[in-house]
Each structure stands twice: as C-alpha cells, then as structure tokens.
C-alpha cells in the first residue's frame, strides 16, 4: 500500500444520516472524504467546520444562514471554519458526489 495514494474502492461507506454516506482517509491531522448526498438528506444543525473540495457529480446547494449558493458539477468549494460561515448543505439533484479536504 502506497501511503501517498488513497484507494477509495477499498474503503467502506459510512452512513451517519439518511441520505448521507462517505468514505474517509485520515493522515497527519487532515482527512480526504468522498461524499455522496441524496435528496433525502436533511442537515440537522448548522455546520461551522471548514471544507475545501470539488463537486464531481450533481448540484449541491449550500445555505449560508439564509444566503443560498448553488454548486454545480465541476465547481470548487472553499468554506472557512467558524460561525460567520455557518452552513447547511442539500442536494438539488437526486445524487451529489463531492470530494472534501478537511481537518480531521
């Protein structure tokens, strides 16, 4: 196994909430997540974590406390951590797939 290569095919899906599943690889205080949201997913609370990533498939909508921003396929995401950038995500398409780099 190459420590600098992430084989998402060998990782198990984690499904913490209905409509949300992800595969995660952690290394050195960071994590790389392959995330899949469906239109069933409802984020239960405001997230204040930072996220950097890209939408691979579908269209993601992020609610920044009343300001809605759409992220179609191929769009990058750069959300700094903290209450000012508090957000909730949802899928505008049946499925959204994205990759996120985050603090572990």
List each language-model region with its residue ranges.
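Short acidic-glycine-tyrosine-enriched beta hairpin
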Residues: 65-83
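Conserved short histidine dyad/triad with adjacent acidic residue
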Residues: 27-47, 81-82
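A short hydrophobic beta-strand segment most commonly corresponding to one strand
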Residues: 78-80, 88, 93-104
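Short, conserved beta-strand element in jelly-roll/cupin
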Residues: 37, 46-62
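Short strand-coil-strand connectors
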Residues: 28, 63-67, 92
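A short, N-terminal "cap"/entry segment at the start of jelly-roll beta-barrel domains
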Residues: 1-35
